[in-house]
Every structure is written in C-alpha cells, then in structure tokens.
C-alpha cells in the first residue's frame, strides 16, 4: 500500500533531484490541462539548483500574462493572493470556529441534563452557580417554545406522511374494522400462529371456507362464491378452484363393507353442483370430471378388480344398468371421474369380477350393458370392452354356465325382468346355441334333471 509523502525537505540530494525532475514535468502537464479545459491564461517560472530556470509555456507567454496581471488594481490583485502567513491564519480561524461549535453542543447537553434533574427532584446532587441557573432558564424557555411549536403544527396539519401504521398485526392488538361493506370474502389464514383476521362490520354475507385436516397443507380458497359446502368425511382432497356453484358430495352410509375414498379430486372448473356417491368396486379408478357443467350422480359399482375409465368426449349420459344384488361389495380406493362431460352420469353396481370395462370414448348415446341378477353362483365376463365409437346403445347379454344343467332355446335377460322365475342357462361351447332343460319337480325325483344332446360335446368342460 502506498503511503502519503511527508511535506518536508528530502535529505538525500540524489533522491531530491530525481523527485524534482519528476514533479517538474508533472506540474507543466497540469498547467497545460488547466489552460485547455478551462480556457484561462497561466504561466510558470521555475528556479532550481539542479538546472537553469524553466518557463512555461514560453518566455513571450510568461511576459504577456505578467503584464496583464500588473495592470489590475492592487485590491483586485491581492483578493485571491495568499502568502504563507495568510494561509496559516485562515487555518487557525477555521479550527477555532469548530472548537466553539463543539463547546456550544456540550453546553446544551449539560443544560438538558440539568433541566431533567430538576424535573426529577435531583437538583441538590450537583452544585450550580448563578451563570448555570441563568443558562438553565434560557434553555428551558427555548425548549418549551420548541414543544409548543411542534404541538401547534400537529394540531393544524396532523401526523406527517412518513408516519404510517404497521403492516402486520401486533400480538394483543385489536384488528382493523371494515364498516359499511356489502359483502366481503375473507380467506382464513393457514397455520399462522397468533395472526388476527380483520373484522367486518355491517356485512351482508361473508363466506369463509373452513380449513381441512391436512397436515402441513395450505389449501387455496375459492373467492366470489355464493356458497361452499365442504364434506368432512374425505381426506387429502383439492377444492374446486373456479367453481360458481356449491359442491355437495354425497356419500352413502347404508352399506356394511364400505371404505371411504382416500384421494378425491374435485372438479376444477365446474359451474354446477357435483354429487358423488360411493363406488363399490375394488381396485378400480374413475377420474373425476374436470370441466363439466351439469351435476354428476354416481352410485355404487359392484365390480371387483375392474377399472372403468369414463368417456372422454360424450354429450349424453352413460347409464350402464347392472344388478346390485350382491353381498360382497368393496369400494374403489382411487376414483377418477369423467373429464369433459356436460350431462350427468349415473353408475350402478356391476356384478363382474376381475373384469375391465373401458367406457365408450366418443359415444353420443348411453351404453347399457344388461346382465342378469339374482344369482348366487354365476360366471362373469373376463374382459368386456364396450363399443368405442358407437352412437346407439349397446346391450350385452351374459351367458351363464352351471354344472348338470342344460337349457333349451335362447336366453336373454335385462335388468327390468322379474328374476323370481328365471331359468338358469347352460352354454355347451357355442355362444349362440343354448338349451333349456325340462321342468322336473325335485320333490318327485330327488335329484337334478339331466338331458343329453347330440349337438354338444363339451358338457364336462362347463364348470363354474
């Protein structure tokens, strides 16, 4: 680090000569810059023991500048001139003024302590003279005048703009009050300890959605909403972000083996209420509808191990009618509802075990698979795929095989028929050829009826 050079005579002659040469060139450079930048006249005459006198810019230039200077009056010439004595006198005056300022500040501080000691009853602790008491009286009057001027200013103009209220509520402080307000929606604070919500006075309706019991989650609040009805039986579910109507999920409670949904996502952009009911299907996932405009009603599905993805672009309700008379129903764990439907979709229980029924993707009419009901032991479809692009309803018939029973004729059943007197069909290997066994009273024969045919050879393979 370069240190500051002391302004003293350099004792070494050689070093002093080198310094002269360097600084002589520097001062001439500075004079050239000064005359060029400021458009002034300047000259320099330098005498030294090391070389002949040096003039700048030239001998003629020096004579011209000196002649012009001597033509000025004496007062004007000495106005900016300063000798060494004058320079020292000016420096002493500046230091004396600075010292007087410090003494005045110290005296004011001493008088202020003296004044507050008198107010506190501590006047006898120190010894004050007559001058001190006089200065105290003057200082007290000056201090009172300043206080009165400040009080008058605050009375006329109030607080300054720099004094603003705190942005956050302080613990124990009263919350602000909003008066004469028609309707204000105040979202609650999530997991903020000690925070105070603003109080709304004279308010027609304030809609505040409740908090959900989700650990560590901050759920978004639906603003500008007429009413919000939120269930309390679901966990880990996302509230609709842009809905304009209440969401009312309905969950059935009359089933014996019911497992509630663990992850249910509500409709994100719906404008009508959505009604959800339990699905009695184990291992199946039905995605929720994302952009529907009509209510969706779901009923329980009795399908074990099957997945029913909903129609993606349908405009009519899909109503598969499946029997619901089954004892062992297990609900879905993850249900994803239809994505873009505009009409309600009604689902009923499917008596199909281990089957996957993908729904129609682009249909415009309902798909109604008809399956017989009222049987205790029946063989169900393994993989039944519904029509992908149909526009008319498709009706499915379910052949059922039982041991030691052969029926004659074609068997067709739907949901609306009376199942009390239905005959159990028997399939002999041909999906389009069914036989009806003769009606024989069991009370008279004591065993199941049996028939033999010449058209079938696979009776021993039809075991349920």
From Swiss-Prot:
Alphabetical keyword list: Coiled coil, DNA-binding, Nucleus, Transcription, Transcription regulation
GO CC field: nucleus
A biological process from GO: positive regulation of transcription by RNA polymerase II
Main location: nucleus
Taxonomy, superkingdom: Eukaryota
Region of interest called Disordered, as start-end residue ranges on this chain: 443-464
Skewed-composition ranges (Low complexity): 451-464
Record carries keyword Glycoprotein: no
Compartments where located: Nucleus
Coiled coil: 85-114
GO molecular function, one term: cis-regulatory region sequence-specific DNA binding
Boundaries of every MADS-box domain copy: 1-60
PANTHER family associated with the record: SERUM RESPONSE FACTOR HOMOLOG
Subunit structure, as described in the record: Interacts with AGL62.
Role according to the record: Putative transcription factor.
Protein name: Agamous-like MADS-box protein AGL92
Highest classification ranks of the organism: Eukaryota, Viridiplantae, Streptophyta, Embryophyta, Tracheophyta
């Amino acid at each position: 680090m370069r240190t500051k050079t002391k302004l003293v005579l350099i004792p070494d002659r050689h070093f002093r000569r080198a310094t002269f040469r360097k600084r002589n060139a520097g001062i001439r450079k500075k004079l050239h810059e000064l005359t060029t930048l400021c458009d002034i006249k300047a000259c320099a005459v330098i005498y030294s023991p090391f070389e002949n006198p040096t003039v700048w810019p030239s001998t003629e230039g020096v004579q011209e500048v000196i002649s012009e200077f001597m033509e000025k009056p004496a007062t004007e010439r000495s106005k900016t001139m300063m000798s060494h004595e004058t320079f020292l006198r000016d420096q002493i005056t500046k230091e004396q003024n600075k010292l007087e300022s410090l003494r005045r500040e110290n005296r004011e501080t001493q008088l202020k302590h003296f004044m507050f000691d008198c107010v506190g009853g501590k006047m006898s602790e120190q010894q004050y003279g007559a001058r001190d008491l006089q200065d105290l009286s003057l200082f007290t009057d000056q201090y009172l005048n300043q206080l009165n001027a400040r009080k008058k200013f605050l009375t006329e103009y109030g607080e300054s703009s720099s004094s603003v209220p705190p942005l956050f509520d302080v613990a124990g402080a009263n919350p602000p009050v909003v008066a004469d307000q028609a309707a204000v929606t105040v979202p609650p604070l999530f997991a903020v300890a000690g925070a105070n919500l603003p109080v709304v006075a004279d308010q027609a309706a304030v809609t505040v959605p409740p908090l959900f019991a989700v650990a560590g989650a901050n759920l978004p609040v639906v603003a500008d909403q007429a009413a919000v009805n939120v269930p309390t039986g679901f966990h880990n579910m996302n509230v609709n972000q842009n809905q304009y109507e209440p969401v009312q999920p309905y969950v059935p409670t009359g089933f014996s083996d019911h497992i509630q949904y663990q992850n249910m996502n509500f409709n994100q952009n719906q404008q009508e209420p959505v009604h959800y009911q339990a699905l009695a299907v184990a291992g199946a996932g039905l995605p929720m509808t994302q952009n529907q405009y009509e209510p969706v009603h779901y009923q329980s599905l009795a399908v074990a191990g099957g997945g029913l993805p909903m129609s993606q672009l349908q405009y009519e309700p899909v109503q598969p009618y499946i029997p619901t008379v089954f004892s062992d129903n297990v609900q879905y764990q993850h249900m994803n509802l239809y994505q873009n439907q505009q009409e309600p979709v009604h689902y009923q229980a499917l008596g199909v075990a281990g089957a996957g029924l993908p729904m129609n993707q682009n249909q415009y009419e309902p798909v109604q698979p008809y399956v017989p009901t009222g049987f205790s032991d029946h063989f169900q479809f393994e993989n039944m795929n519904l029509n992908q692009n149909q526009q008319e309803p498709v009706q499915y018939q379910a052949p059922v095989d039982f041991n030691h029973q052969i029926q004659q004729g074609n068997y067709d059943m739907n949901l609306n028929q009376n199942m009390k007197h239905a005959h159990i069909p028997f399939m002999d290997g041909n999906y389009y050829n069914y036989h009806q066994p003769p009606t024989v009273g069991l009370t008279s024969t004591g065993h199941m009826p049996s028939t033999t045919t010449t058209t079938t050879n696979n009776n021993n393979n039809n075991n349920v």
